[in-house]
Design a protein with these regions (language model features):
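Active-site-proximal beta-alpha core segment in soluble small-molecule metabolic enzymes
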Residues: 2-110
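Active-site loop/helix belt of alpha/beta enzymes
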Residues: 60, 66-174
Length: 175
């Protein structure tokens, strides 16, 4: 993506082990590109901060929220506020905002899917307000998946993650 001229690249999987170094290697090689990633636990944030500081880079990190998928992310609440504060305070990383993956919202009825999405986004907005009330920066919100892309695309208060429209996951034809 860096070679292709992308200016903003989000690695939407939490890097661990040697992948931390690989990400920072790309960020160092393509200094004109804003590389960022997600994190959902203090160990990962610490590893990212330590490696970024050693590389002389400040890496934007999105707090990965579990909004119902149950696969990645930290549930909105006090533990997530504490983790966001850690991202904000450690040298080497900075808060990029909130990341959410809503792949569990794939009802075949668009009205049902929209209602569930709106409820989920209300929770995200409430959590964001909690962070801001604690004087923690929330520069942005990024989220989405293939089935909810049309909903995210209609809102300018956050960025869309387009899902798998190029690869088209099995079964999405019916959703």
């Amino acid at each position: 993506l860096g070679q292709a001229g992308a200016r903003d690249v989000l690695l939407a999987n939490q890097p661990v082990g040697p992948n931390v170094g690989r990400l920072l290697g790309l960020a160092g090689w393509f200094r004109e590109v804003r590389f960022s990633t997600i994190a959902d636990d203090a160990g990962a944030v610490g590893a990212l901060a330590e490696a970024a500081q050693a590389a002389g880079i400040t890496l934007p990190v999105w707090l990965d929220l579990d909004v119902g998928m149950g696969r990645t992310g930290i549930a909105p609440g006090q533990a997530a506020i504490t983790l966001h504060k850690l991202i904000d305070q450690l040298p080497g990383v900075e808060s990029a905002g909130l990341h959410l993956y809503d792949g569990h919202l794939h009802d075949s009825d668009p009205a049902q899917r929209l209602a569930k999405w709106q409820s989920m986004m209300d929770e995200v907005r409430s959590f964001r307000a909690s962070l801001e009330a604690a004087c923690l920066p929330v520069p942005g919100v990024v989220g989405g998946g293939t089935p909810t892309f049309p909903f995210h695309a209609q809102h300018t208060d956050h960025e869309c993650s387009p899902g798998t429209t190029l690869l088209w996951d099995f079964g999405y034809r019916d959703k």
